[in-house]
Amino acid sequence: MYKRQEKYLPKLCSGEWLGAFGLTEPGAGTDAQGQQTTAVEDGDYWVLNGSKIFITNAGYADVFIVIAVTDKVLDKKGRPTKLCSAFIVERTDPGFSVGKAEDKMGIRGSSTCELIFEDCRIPKDRMLGVRGKGFQLAMATLDGGRIGIASQALGIAEGALQETVAYVKERKQFGRSISAFQNTQFELAEMKARIEAAKYLVYAAALKKQEAMNGAKVRYSVEAAQAKLIAARTASDVTRRCLQLFGGYGYTRDYPIERMMRDAKITEIYEGTSEVQMMVISGALLK
């Protein structure tokens, strides 16, 4: 364990290496338990076969955490079920390749690619954590990731509002600044209030995660889901309203609002869709 930490963490933390997380598959998006990628023992190696899609950083990453099926067992009701494990895969491992880069609507500066495993052989000590507990590891990773995406959404919304406030002060129609019109003022006020509400949810989730990192036996799945759900929706709504206040200029690339609007949408999709966040929240309520 410590040898792996010494090998990977310094380079990842310094930025010399970039990492990526491989969970999503062509047939396993929201249904993350529907994994098809497999890892089979072969002497001192694991042999991986399958593919992953929509993997952030994949085009440039040096090391990947990959979730793959290692065991098939019967659950308490006698139904067949899959157990997944987590593995460390290096870019240079035989049988591993990075597929096509996605041509995305937004976050175009972020590399998003397919991962392909064709009899990819990795040393046995590259299993991460406990065998059969990869799904739990993935879900814990997503809890933290959702706070990060909520923060991203919050930043997009705040940036869009700042750009819009500056624009409406300068833009003149009917002989005066459009910031003088009540409609503009009410739009700005509502956007500001919604952003601040989202901010408190994001900070509350981050605080709960910090408590867990400091040793407290607390979970933050619901807080992370709430923060992501509201912050992502806020980002999409705020950028749409901001573009409307920009008018035709907002629809051009002379101003950043159109990019912010495109970037906002992905926050409602990755690290779990908004619908998944509602499943997490309602599941806790009805438990």
Regions found by a protein language model. Give the residues of each.
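A short, Trp-centered hydrophobic/proline-enriched beta-strand micro-motif
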Residues: G15-L23
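A short core secondary-structure module
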Residues: N49-V98
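Flexible, small-/acidic-enriched active-site or ligand-binding loops
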Residues: G34, T92-R121
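Short Gly/Pro-enriched turn/cap motifs at secondary-structure boundaries
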Residues: G27-T30, F54-N57, K77-R79, K104-S111
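Alpha-helical interface subdomain recognition
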Residues: R4, K11, G15, G29-A32, ...
